[in-house]
Amino acid sequence: IVNDMSELDVDGVLIANTEIVDAASNNFVSISADSISSRSGIQKLDSALKNLLEKRSPDFILLETSGSSHPLPLVRYLREHPQVSLKAFLSLVDTVMLNDDYDGGKKLIPVFQEHLNRGTRGVESLLAEQIMFCNKLLLTKNDRLPFYVVTEVARAIHPLNP
């Protein structure tokens, strides 16, 4: 299941044109023009899962969300779903962005805490939550930074998900 916030459904089109998945085999669903973590997105996810599980009994289902998806509504939904069980929650985090925009990742937690104290939400809230609620975290774009910088970024965000 692929989620793309855009109506263009770029991710869905790219994945649908592979040898591994296709809609005709009932092993692929794309949910576009909505956030899968929103109320309407959860309804679309529910429908997609029903369609997938009607004709198949897959060993696993991979759910690829938009980068702007909030993890907690998805975790709650999947935890309560009668036919599936959540085994892993993987977050991909852009190491270059953390390095450039958050001083090697060191400013992410203080800015997130500032939002919590003010009762506001910012992109830092979403980013911190995506790190906090995952059980697997991959730092991406590591090839663009020296190894020691990637290590420093990893150390800086580690308190969010020890």
Across the structure, where does each feature detected by a protein language model lie?
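Nucleotide-state-sensitive switch-loop elements of NTP-binding domains
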Residues: I1-T120, S125
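GTPase G-domain guanine-specificity segment
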Residues: L14, D103, K141-N161
